[in-house]
Amino acid sequence: MPKIKICGLKREEDVSFVNIAKPDYAGFVFAGVKRKIDFNTAVRFRSLLDDTIQSVGVFVNDKIDNIVNLCEDKTIDLVQLHGGEDESYIGRLKERIKKPVVKAVRVKDKIYSAATKADFMLFDTYSSFEYGGSGKIFDWDLLKEFRNPFFLAGGLNRDNIAEAVKKLNPYCVDLSSGVETNGVKDLNKIIETVKILRSL
């Protein structure tokens, strides 16, 4: 059974939804437009989040100091880098924090291994104009040779999640648009998707 991340919480209601459904991780996005929140909102949301759920900060080419501050004040339990952060950046960040770091990769070609200082890779759908949250899946066969634990994102929802897990056995599945209706988190979709995953 994989771990579950519900990403892109924008409203207090979204926090209450994940508190009901009890995924393993809840994601706060600090970049982009559709699901972006500011640091103060993240602090407030973290205070409302169930203690059993770990918070993930999603950053795109942000200042390392900003990430360190959110880790030190315990707003963020895990760091997800979703931009063009290179190994030098990851190394400098890991020298300053003890939290796990996830590096996102937008998949275009077959991936066999990952030489990275990050603790996990996250595989998402490739797009030339956005860093994630596209709602589109990619060719999962491109990951069939990858053997390390990884996070799987990209168009996952209640209709395809069981197939994805059966095919790839990811460490964690990352859901965002797949648990939304008209651009906002949907409690029923979250509960149903978590239930499917917990039964695998």
From Swiss-Prot:
It holds the Pfam family PRAI. It catalyses: N-(5-phospho-beta-D-ribosyl)anthranilate = 1-(2-carboxyphenylamino)-1-deoxy-D-ribulose 5-phosphate. GO terms for biological process: L-tryptophan biosynthetic process. InterPro entries: Aldolase_TIM, PRAI_dom, RibuloseP-bd_barrel, TrpF_fam. It is an enzyme of class 5 (isomerase). The keyword Isomerase applies. CDD domains: PRAI (cd00405). Keywords: Amino-acid biosynthesis, Aromatic amino acid biosynthesis, Isomerase, Tryptophan biosynthesis. One of its GO terms (molecular function) is phosphoribosylanthranilate isomerase activity. Belongs to the TrpF family. Pathway: Amino-acid biosynthesis; L-tryptophan biosynthesis; L-tryptophan from chorismate: step 3/5. This is N-(5'-phosphoribosyl)anthranilate isomerase. Its EC number is 5.3.1.24.
